[in-house]
């Protein structure tokens, strides 16, 4: 059940992430509501195309693998994501004595910032703030920009981001429609607070508050008394309800098995080091694969120089198990090469096949040299 609950937050339907990892069908609740999600038997999921970037290179030894909890299979110690996902998806958690609250940022801005840090590792947090303007949350809402707070987050990993709900005034119906709320706040919390203010007589301008969430998205409606100024009502609500709230950033991460608090700039630099390591390992993996292939083809090339001799050796061998040793002895090739050659069908030894293999040998030599 815990795994399913975790997956719910990763789905497109839950709307917690700017870029969901899981494409979903069914009811997965909403991050801005306490509405329960459906049981697993009523939902369908599959990895989103976005995940191709999360797992890129995982089959090329880009990261280390270890045994899972019961040693029945191997699992990666970390995923070789091709972009700084830790800054694109919000992260929240508590370990022993360590709390973590990492805000999400716009993917395009993070990519621009990463490229800038790659070109200039000495880039300052202020220069970075020109490219990465501020955190960006899936719930929407306006960021109340404060340069000092933003620079603190970028430099130290600590600070707060103030968010304010977005709304429109429907003059015809004389009501306020709240369309976006701060990240981490639920519609139930807001309604409960507004209802309490109405009961205590502190919000006489509002006659009713309704949850109008539907398939089209989030909507919280406030009916107003005639002659009420909607701007003044919202100013009061921003002050007394979660329609305006803050997100406290605390960027604690694990680097080389050690807990560290990093700012955005340091995170990008650490991710660049990690990604360069992944890319280097992928190149080594591909080079080794090409070297193995070249080794087999070099053995095949030796056979192709005297194909009649190879056929004679096979034909004159009495037992199947002696074919490999006899080819090894006859052409001075190793067992791996002999096994590879023995598996090739006779029909493949035509002129076209031979020319293609010779070209492939030359191509592999060039690629490995590069």
Where are the language model's segments positioned?
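Short beta-strand elements
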Residues: 12-17, 51, 84-87, 161-169
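Long insertion/accessory domains within large nucleic-acid-processing enzymes
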Residues: 71-88, 93-96, 100-101
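C-terminal interaction appendages of subunits in large macromolecular complexes
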Residues: 45, 49, 91-94, 98-370
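Long, structured ligand/cofactor-binding scaffold of large enzymes
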Residues: 1-56
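A short alpha-helix capping/helix-loop junction motif
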Residues: 21-28, 62-64, 249-250
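Conserved alpha/beta core surface patches that mediate binding of polyanionic ligands
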Residues: 2-14, 70-82, 155-160, 196, ...
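P-loop NTPase nucleotide-binding/switch module
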Residues: 30-33, 54-81
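Short coil/turn connectors at secondary-structure junctions
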Residues: 16, 59-60, 83, 90-91, ...
